[in-house]
Amino acid sequence: MENVSNVDKVESIKSLQSTIRKLENALSQMTQKGANTTLVKKRLKAVCIGLAVLENVWNQESHQYIDEELAEARNILAGLLPSIEKAYDKSKAGSPQRTLLTRRIKALELSIQAIDKLFNK
């Protein structure tokens, strides 16, 4: 966790911010259609927590999350990885989609490490 380059930090934060926007848009559309939004809400909260924890570890910004929320977010973020990795495996080498997925995987992995680091203090 300590040896993360500034480029990786910036890309990870941007990736998580992009993921948050994507989930917010999905939540809005699903709400309008009357669809069940529980899963999207949980994922949105988990990604927000992941971003807050990375900013806490890297930029010493405070976060207001309790241990139970951190633990739940960690499990949700870890649960997202297999489906993203599967999409990555199906993507074409050098494609913008693969670049996006690479950054998203890295950001999620770093978020999980950051949450683990908070628990091991």
Segments predicted by a language model, with ranges:
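Short, charged, amphipathic alpha-helical segments
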Residues: 35-46, 96-107
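Amphipathic protein-protein interaction modules
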Residues: 63-93, 98, 102
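Short acidic DE-rich linear segments
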Residues: 2, 8, 14, 118-121
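Short amphipathic alpha-helical segments that mediate assembly, nucleic-acid/protein binding
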Residues: 6-9, 37, 70, 98
